[in-house]
Regions:
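Non-catalytic signal-transmission and effector/linker regions of two-component phosphorelay proteins
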Residues: 1-9
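Conserved acidic carboxylate
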Residues: 12
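Alpha-helical interaction/dimerization surfaces of two-component signaling modules
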Residues: 24-28, 47
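A generic structural motif
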Residues: 29-34, 83-85
């Protein structure tokens, strides 16, 4: 029996960037399944809890809730018996990248 393919959740409020990220991920990591793509931090938390993906790709600057705030909310709500997914922050803003590293992101 082969292990299940890893599943990912993408949280990106810019549709073109979300599509580009999906395309790049498919090319670089063919076995990765994109479980869902959402456009804001609140939906990211809800979908991550519902789908429990293996990898999260969060834009940092999103409407409603930033990716950083969504990651904190998700960590607080994540089931204790489940391993927390790998978290990758996606940003073009240096100041947010520093904050993400301080939060021990990938």
């Amino acid at each position: 029996m082969t292990p299940a393919a890893p599943r990912a959740l993408i949280a990106e409020d810019e549709p073109l960037l979300a599509a580009a990220l999906q395309q790049e991920l498919r090319a670089a990591w063919p076995e990765l399944q994109i479980a869902a793509t959402v456009g804001d931090g609140l939906s990211a938390v809800q979908q991550a809890l519902a789908l429990q993906p293996d990898v999260l790709f969060f834009d940092i600057r999103m409407p409603g809730q930033t990716g950083l705030d969504a990651a904190v909310a998700l960590a607080d709500a994540w089931p204790a018996h489940q391993p927390f997914p790998a978290l990758v922050f996606v940003t073009a803003y240096d100041q947010y990248a520093v904050q993400a590293f301080e939060a021990q992101a990938v």
